[in-house]
Amino acid sequence: MSRIGKRIIEIPSSVQASVEGSKLLFKNNKEKHELETHNRVKITLENNQLSFQPVGEDAQFRAYWGTYGALANNIVIGLSAGFSKTLEVNGVGYKVALGHKTLDLSLGFSHPVKYPIPAGIEMVVEKNTITIKGSDKQQVGQVAAEIRSFRPPEPYKGKGVKYSNEVIIRKAGKTAKK
């Protein structure tokens, strides 16, 4: 029995939900998201409460039950409150600036790195901190991971791009000979 799948998802008043066959449609005043279930789960929407039931008794259907429950819950949270990730840029000469539809990063390469900001993502830059906001949890995490991958933090001095809550395990440098 899936503990995540059997949870009932409360839909706030700021989000409208509707079921069309095997599709779930969510929208608020700005955006809309769609979740296709491919008839792997049975969808029930009553009184702004959304629930799922597995179609069969097979283990695969029970796995989809929890997966679609989590995906629908993430869409509801994203449309009502949104998701955000914060990145920190540490290092001498490492700079971040917000251009027109691009994020300009100076990370010690011979050239500046220009990252195009995808649709549905909003970025805020303060000093050397990048805040990535959006309604799609997967897209926010993907953008943060792509920016971090340009210069991941190194273990000796901690220079690079890291998540704000990430702990970098430091290594000792070379020791002098006696």
Curated annotation (Swiss-Prot):
Gene Ontology terms, MF aspect: rRNA binding; structural constituent of ribosome
Listed GO CC annotations: cytosolic large ribosomal subunit
Family annotation (Pfam families): Ribosomal_L6
Keyword entries, A-Z: Ribonucleoprotein, Ribosomal protein, RNA-binding, rRNA-binding
GO biological process, one term: cytoplasmic translation
Known function: This protein binds to the 23S rRNA, and is important in its secondary structure. It is located near the subunit interface in the base of the L7/L12 stalk, and near the tRNA binding site of the peptidyltransferase center.
Subunit structure: Part of the 50S ribosomal subunit.
Family per record: Belongs to the universal ribosomal protein uL6 family.
Protein name: Large ribosomal subunit protein uL6
Protein species of origin: Helicobacter pylori (strain J99 / ATCC 700824)
Gene encoding the protein: rplF
